[in-house]
Design a protein with these regions (language model features):
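The feature captures the beta-strand-to-loop junction immediately N-terminal to the Walker
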Residues: 81-83
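Catalytic Walker B motif of ABC-type/P-loop ATPase nucleotide-binding domains
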Residues: 190-194
Length: 248
């Protein structure tokens, strides 16, 4: 696999490559600030997506999203929940621009970080090389990359693996790198699809401390979660049901 460096979200789900709103393929310019409540950093409206399954006489349509919509405001942590197959990951991919919707609009204000459910990393690159590669794609200079990388190694507790190739990493350490790539540019909006799969308890706790810090800094986080214990960390919960995003 050849690394692709450049603007935009990159291949579908590649470890957190988001970008600012000018880079996200499905993003439109964010709403203009006016008097009243703060503008949302993310607004999705009327998102529909249907997959085609089977071949020949068995070919059929499988509607997944049926006019789904949601929004996030600055300084919010929102949980996205729902049964398996309810469309959570599909919606996340559409929000970040890694998957085209059949209809609907997505408005994003600011830089986006994306952590896909399954880490898609380059087996022959080290953690340091991943962070350097993605930092260039984010438009960061070397000093900014090094400073951010050091903080992420410390906050997620995987600095001893920085010079190790991904092929030699455990699943939990790959998950840490996957999350670090999304956090690298200090995005205004962080989209996380079950980001802590494979984390031990200590790292799981570190994750929520880090997330609380982002809320305090006015950043927004959308987290796909299956854990009941996560609910205490969310400001709001949105449930995917019947192809729509419904406030719980």
């Amino acid at each position: 696999m050849t690394p692709q460096v450049g603007p935009g979200p990159g291949p579908a789900g590649v470890g957190g490559l988001g970008g600012d709103r000018s880079r996200a393929p499905l993003a439109r310019d964010g709403p203009t600030t006016t008097e009243g409540p703060p503008c949302p950093v993310l607004r999705a409206t009327g998102i529909t997506k249907t997959y085609r399954r089977g071949v020949g006489p068995r070919r059929h349509d499988l509607p997944v999203l049926r006019g789904a919509g949601l929004q996030l405001c600055a300084g919010e942590i929102v949980g996205l929940v729902g049964e398996n197959g309810s469309g959570k990951s599909t919606l996340m991919k559409i929000l970040v621009g890694a998957l085209a919707a059949d209809a609907g609009t997505v408005e994003v204000s600011g830089r986006v970080g994306y952590c896909p459910q399954d880490p898609l990393l380059y087996e022959r690159l080290t953690c340091d090389e991943h962070l350097a590669l993605f930092g260039v794609a984010y438009g960061m200079d070397t000093t900014a990359i090094d400073t951010a990388a050091d903080k992420l190694y410390d906050s997620l507790g995987f600095g001893r693996w920085r010079a190790i190739q991904v092929a030699e990493l455990s699943g939990g350490t790959r998950a840490k790198l996957n999350l670090a790539l999304a956090l690298l540019p200090d995005p205004d909006l962080l989209l996380l699809d079950e980001p802590y799969a494979g984390f031990d308890w200590d790292t799981y706790q570190r994750f929520w401390e880090l997330t609380a810090g982002r809320r305090a800094a006015g950043r927004s986080v959308l987290v796909v979660s299956h854990f009941v214990s996560d609910q205490e960390h969310f400001d709001r919960i949105v449930e995917m049901r019947d192809g729509k995003a419904t406030p719980r």
